[in-house]
């Protein structure tokens, strides 16, 4: 015991001298590996009934992207509930959350040694450390007293790091717990430089009243950014209201935004609040704001300028305290030059512009996100584990992801379903054959050639069937040329966005 404590006291100096929070965490786990001679370890943060990996040693990188629900992982639940050191018997039948994820071991973990150290501050769980060794007798000589010492040291280090983060990034917030404002429901996954910069910008603007314009390609996660801005602000206890401007028929757009009174138009059988009023005191997220007509842009501008709105059919002005976060995949300043977007509205919305980088510029985040989605689909399919094969990891890194994060999510979920269909086992591995990511076309998007082969038009079919086949081919061709962007497709086909979505559903494209 004395020898171990002496080692740790010496190492504490290294922990305190580390320049960054991540460096401290990595040093902690390296020390655990060296002192305890384990094969893998992980430092986990506890929030929203999930364990979130902050640092890992001896585990696949995808683990950093996973969020482990304690309800779905009995070993982690035991650690969370115990309040003290947990030793799992080498013959334990409880599934291990790291099955297939230890870097020097392929496949399911059978007999092995596993210990969980809950990290407690004032008897409140803030995290945990897990330690695994492939030798089932590796930790037999290790005393609980020694493990409690490690746990206390790690708990203090984690607590200090969280407090420093709160002071650095949330100094302007009221005194609520920072964890309440930054939870899994609005978490943005990514450690790349572009995403770290984005996180810093979100933290800077969240607790202001500035309008924010979120820019980025389709599928990068603009809605998630809006969600994070709202939940890290003083408005978090009020509504976040979503409106997809691209799917808004022109005939009802004004009513959707501002509401209407009874009798304002045919079918208006009662008073109805619009999105501005629904978001009063909170945040209104205008997705695809570049799709609004010039007429509606003028009315939106007035609401932003004066802080009041008029319901359709009503002469009264209603004061609203609504913050606007808008998003677009268009280059709005180019739209202004082309006369399709009002310059004054653009300047109102883009007081604080944010750019979400495409996934092809975030190579180091691809595997984190793949792990995140693999853990999600594991829970939904009721599996013990879903892991990525080494060859697949290499392919995921090399692919350029034209559909961005949304495409990655879809292909991981599709591959998991295919893998589950191949085997009755509860532990599955996703392999390259389950993916079709060798061409620029999204794997979830049928190609034009495939559509033409399936829907070649013959003279012996009816007019409606032939018309449907032609429309389907045309929409698929436009979608492919616009990289799956529905709003751009609607413009190319000169269709109302709402009508295009309805037509696509009828034709079986959506």
From Swiss-Prot:
Task: Give a Pfam family name.
Answer: GAF
Does the keyword Cytoplasm belong to this entry?
A: no
Q: Which domain of life is it from?
A: Bacteria
Q: Which GO terms describe its molecular function?
A: ATP binding; ATP hydrolysis activity; DNA binding; DNA-binding transcription factor activity
Pathway assigned in UniProt: Nitrogen metabolism; nitric oxide reduction
Q: Which PROSITE patterns match?
A: SIGMA54_INTERACT_1, SIGMA54_INTERACT_2, SIGMA54_INTERACT_3, SIGMA54_INTERACT_4
Q: What is this protein called?
A: Anaerobic nitric oxide reductase transcription regulator NorR
Annotated DNA-binding residue span(s): 486-505
The record's section on PANTHER family has: ANAEROBIC NITRIC OXIDE REDUCTASE TRANSCRIPTION REGULATOR NORR, TRANSCRIPTIONAL REGULATORY PROTEIN
| NCBIfam families per the UniProt record, alphabetical | PRK05022.1
Q: Which SMART domains match?
A: AAA, GAF
Which HAMAP family did the record assign?
Answer: NorR
Record carries keyword Zinc: no
Functionally, this protein is described as follows: Required for the expression of anaerobic nitric oxide (NO) reductase, acts as a transcriptional activator for at least the norVW operon. Activation also requires sigma-54.
Query: Which residues take part in binding ATP?
Result: 216-223, 279-288
**One record GO biological process:** phosphorelay signal transduction system
Which UniProt keywords are present, listed alphabetically? ATP-binding, DNA-binding, Nucleotide-binding, Transcription, Transcription regulation
Residue ranges constituting the Sigma-54 factor interaction domain according to the UniProt record? 188-417
Family matches, as CDD domains? AAA
